[in-house]
Amino acid sequence: MTWLNEAEVKTAKDKQVKAMAALKQSLTSAVQKHMDEKVKERNYDSILSLCTYATSTAAKFSKEGQAAVEWRDEVWAKGYAILADVEGGERAIPTVDELLSELPSFVWPGA
């Protein structure tokens, strides 16, 4: 007689949840990389690093930091809205390039 270990049983729902988690991880990593790469144009280490300059006493850095905070918020709002639409079956899963093309663009202050 074979015993069934219920902890090892994977349902279709379990597989779907796991696939969605992997998809979210993949797409959110791509969005994060996209933002980090953009700010390296001006020698910032990452979007997080640039955002810390929003409270700088140097006007140039403060403007760039605040612009980055606003852009980051817009990007994540749009990115998570797209993921919610995918989860809800309202749209197909975008490729990374498709996702990135739908995100707001960053414009450096004074550019």
Give the label of every model feature segment.
Residues M1-A111:
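A preference for well-ordered globular domain cores
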